[in-house]
Amino acid sequence: MRNFAIGLLLLTLGSVIVQPLIEIVNLGREKIILSTAVITSARSAKDRSLEYKSQRDLNAVVNEKLFAEYFSDAFMKSMNLSLVNADGINKYRFKPQDDKYNDIIVTLDFVEVGDGVSDQFVTTVKMRTETEYKYKTKAMKIVETMGNNASNNLVEEQTLILSIKN
């Protein structure tokens, strides 16, 4: 009977220790998925939104509206999302169709500067993606409901530098 009690205690302690570790692995996985979706969407939008007239002069001038449109379209398809609203061309709110994530907010900032050496223009796009992390394991969901209501945000920031080289 004593061995049975010790085995039960070890099993309980093992599950208490393992569940947060599983949640950390899930958090890393979600961060990788979000990062990959942002990078892929940005690459898709960059190629299609550069203005042709500026490309002839080796200037990387981006049509911001087209970039945002292509980016949001590719991001929606890659993460299985639907667009809730767009605040101008710089801020988008997406809602997941499969209830896998919480609402995702994407902010795009465009900066167009000269490169300082020649007369070329370089465009920098800063993308910030933010969502509240949704716990996957049952124990962590219970801890979240009993907790201090502190939100655990999952934030991904990427910078895309667009330049044209001769």
How should these model regions be labeled?
Residues R48-N166:
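Short, conserved structural patches
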